[in-house]
Amino acid sequence: MKFVDEVEIRVDAGDGGNGCISFRREKYIPKGGPDGGDGGDGGDVYLEADENLNTLIDYRFERFHKAERGKNGMGKNCTGRRGNDIVLPVPPGTRATDIDTGEVLGDLTKHGQRLMVAKGGFHGLGNTRFKSSINRAPRQKTDGTPGEVRPLKLELMLLADVGLLGMPNAGKSTFIRSVSAARPKVADYPFTTLIPNLGVVRPAPHQSFVIADIPGLIEGAAEGAGLGIQFLKHLERCRLLLHLVDLAPFDETDPAEQARIIINELEKYSPKLAEKPRWLVINKVDLLLDEEVQEKVDELVKSLNWDGPVFQIAALEGRGSDALCREVMSYLETLPAPDTEQHEEADPVEFMWDTYHEEVLEEEMDDEDDDDDDDHDVEVIYQK
């Protein structure tokens, strides 16, 4: 199945049903008074995280989604039925953004989590609502309000503990193959990896973490060079980044310069992402003599002014990979669980009709005297 991690859709909540003007008419009760019922509320639109999905491809072809309209009110104080909601399943890790305002409506990170993205219209009020001691036969009603319409941008951000960064052919896919059961394509040409890959690493029994491999970055990626930076968003939820550097590139470029390119592109994309914990992992040490390796590593660390952890591995042989994974696992265990991490409280999403019913009732009651004057000396006709 094709991997699609970004789509644009439109969601239409259902309109509210109209209120009814009706009067009670029964045998021996010629003037029974108003009995028009309210309409039904329009259906809402929800997104729901479904762990059985891993792509947004379905919404590439089906882009318009509309909830059901509320039914109109009827006589005998019968309220119209509420419109049915619609629930759109999305993969865990999906973020919903309002295209018009740029407002992030929410993130769906757990299976079964729901997010309302469009609120149905409020029901219209029947004429029963407007009766009073001085207005016994009101001919007032309100129509249901239209449901909200939102153009949405859905972005899938993979849920992983560790993310891999590096130039093309730095050995990221080889590394993830050596430490997990993931089998991304590996070849000796750039951009072999075209989509993100996930792997589960198990350094010890009952211990595991998820690692994400994304396509490599090149200079100018922020301006769209290569595959651009579209896949960097998949690292935003990672708690640790592993920056893989090829110590012996086949084109004999400077490893330090390649590392600086990645750091610069990361900072251009998101300063917040650039501040995440990042470890330097020097790969392909098996292509050099042992005495050359340490010398080149020291030069690289000095050139980058690197003061963080540094690891040397040969991903193809698996040398150093297990030790690195154990260190990663130990580090992750020192961090708070993702569910208990402190997050800034998001502002509540404002929906169009949250206070509509209070405003309508206040407005109608304020205008009640004017309506009574209009009804003076008017003959009331009762009918079924």
UniProtKB/Swiss-Prot annotation:
Its main location: cytoplasm. Residues 160-333 form the OBG-type G domain. CDD domains: Obg. It is an enzyme of class 3 (hydrolase). One of its GO terms (cellular component) is cytoplasm. One of its GO terms (biological process) is ribosome biogenesis. Signal peptide: none annotated. PROSITE patterns: G_OBG, GTP1_OBG, OBG. Residues 1-159 form the Obg domain. Residues 360-377 have a biased composition (Acidic residues). It comes from the Bacteria. Its EC number is 3.6.5.-. Mg(2+) binds at S173, T193. An essential GTPase which binds GTP, GDP and possibly (p)ppGpp with moderate affinity, with high nucleotide exchange rates and a fairly low GTP hydrolysis rate. Plays a role in control of the cell cycle, stress response, ribosome biogenesis and in those bacteria that undergo differentiation, in morphogenesis control. NCBIfam families: Obg_CgtA, PRK12297.1, PRK12299.1. This is GTPase Obg. It comes from Idiomarina loihiensis (strain ATCC BAA-735 / DSM 15497 / L2-TR). The lineage of its organism: Bacteria, Pseudomonadati, Pseudomonadota, Gammaproteobacteria, Alteromonadales. The gene is obg.
